Amino acid sequence: MKKNLTLFAVIAVMFATLLTGCASAPQFETEAESAQRPILIQGPMPIEAEKFAQRLDKVKVEKSGTFVFYIGKLDKYPVIVAKTGKGMENTAAATAVAIEKYDPIAIINQGTSGGHDPSLNVFDIVLGERTTNIGSLKTGHLEENEGIEPTNWIPMDLMASEGSAGEDPNAEKARYYEGDADLLAAANAVKDKYTKGKVVKGTIGSADVWNNEVDRINWFHENYGTSVEEMEGAAAAQIAKAYDVPFLGIRVLSNNKTNGGQYNPNTAEANQDYVYEVVKQYISKIHEK
């Protein structure tokens, strides 16, 4: 009888240990998953964000102010799509909120853009080897009734110092934010999967200005080296730089006034499809580490 009780006790302990192991395994996996820093994908308008969000698994939606965050998984890795709203201020705020709240491992700002380079066509995609604020400008000194001279305006680097940029001679230049090398490598690795246009490296210009003057567009292209313009990327790049988060802008041409390329709204979905492949490639490299 004593032997039977001893045997029963041993079996009970083994069974309890087995149950504990089974229960702790999912818990360990959950803790491991929660330790993964998400990739943040930004899109300004619904047409530029929601298609990507629909392709995520296990999505939950969170809001902060007017900003919407679609939190899900891609290839079992955490990815967040942020619908930031249009413009530099919205994007800067949404980027800061996302970094503080979600601690992303990398940020991709993507969407549509207008062409500055006449060699680029609608549906072509520009990888932001550089991103710059083309709305930060300093005018010349002219008195009343002396007119305005926009072509004589010069860049103003607000980040050159903590003091007044208007009085700082070192601030009279454009600031370029470099695209992250690993994100660029991922984008280049899958560019042959994009068949609706070509994928090139270039300079993305951003400002809260909608330029319809071709001579003005050409001026930016010549003086800043811009490939395209939009209204968000440089703001996101500036905040990402402040927090030391890897950043890349990816923009598709939805129109190009320099060569007559007409607006096509389908470019927004095409760009999201390409960025989806970029993110999958980037995740595969994370898994290899």
Language-model-derived ranges and their functions:
Residues 257-289:
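His/Asp/Glu-rich mid-to-C-terminal helical/loop segments that flank catalytic regions of hydrolases
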Residues 103-105:
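Proline-aspartate-enriched helix->loop->beta-strand connector
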Residues 117-221:
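Mid-sequence, gly/pro-rich, charge-dense loop/helix-turn segments that line enzyme active sites
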Residues 1-9:
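Bacterial N-terminal signal peptides that target proteins for export
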Residues 26-96:
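N-terminal short beta-loop-beta anion/metal-coordinating cradle
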Residues 207-249, 258:
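A C-terminal functional module that forms or caps the active site or interfaces directly
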Residues 19-21:
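C-terminal motif of bacterial Sec signal peptides marking the signal peptidase cleavage site
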